[in-house]
A protein has these predicted regions:
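Short, contiguous alpha-helical
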Residues: 9, 13, 28-78, 123-167
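Conserved catalytic core of Hanks-type protein kinase domains
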Residues: 25, 43, 112
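Acidic/histidine-rich alpha-helical segments that form the ligand environment
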Residues: 77-120, 131-136
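Alpha-helical packing segments of well-folded alpha/beta enzyme cores
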Residues: 8-19, 47, 91, 95-109, ...
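N-terminal leader/capping segments at the start of a protein or of a new domain
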Residues: 1, 5-29
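Generic structural signal for secondary-structure transition and capping sites
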Residues: 17, 28, 49, 104, ...
Length: 167
């Protein structure tokens, strides 16, 4: 594996650890801005699933594999598919299973990724592979922080956080 891909993969492993720790600790039922925390978590997981590799060549498997309807990832009432119902709580087990599926998919993707194709756009996609990866780093960590704050408000404790000192 080329050095740049290895470094991206290494940083993603840290992100995976932070995401998993958040799912394990999250208060899933707490409502913030009309949505419960489980929906925010599912939103960023679904985004990683769809946008990390190629959103234009994507098929959602989460409903078939884990029983999670795709529209539950929509957390903005202005977007198509939005369902306002804060009583729909996605279980921790389903979130962890879906996370494991995404993690495996991304780890397999890293095995085929090269420095050269990081700067290329996949078929029918308007962004380079590197842009999509960086966008998901930003998006997932923003939402992991939001979920951590929601959980802090109810439990009065912060979840673990891993950074470069993880190694």
């Amino acid at each position: 594996m080329e050095e740049i891909v290895s470094q991206i993969k290494s940083q993603m492993e840290i992100n995976f650890k932070n995401i998993e720790d958040q799912i394990l600790m999250a208060d899933l039922e707490t409502v913030f801005d009309c949505e419960n925390n489980s929906r925010y978590i599912f939103h960023y997981l679904h985004s990683m699933d769809k946008f990390f590799i190629n959103p234009d060549n994507y098929v959602y498997e989460g409903e078939k594999l884990f029983g999670i309807p795709e529209n539950l990832s929509v957390i903005d009432s202005a977007r198509p598919g939005y369902e306002k119902d804060s009583s729909i709580v996605i279980s921790r087990e389903k979130l962890l299973d879906y996370f494991g599926y995404i993690k495996n998919k991304i780890e397999n993707y890293f095995e085929t990724l090269t420095a050269e194709n990081l700067l290329q756009k996949p078929d029918n996609c308007r962004h380079t592979r590197l842009e999509m990866i960086l966008a998901q780093f930003r998006h997932s960590m923003w939402h992991t922080g939001l979920s951590s704050a929601i959980t802090f408000e109810s439990k009065k404790t912060w979840n673990k956080f891993s950074g470069l000192n993880r190694y």
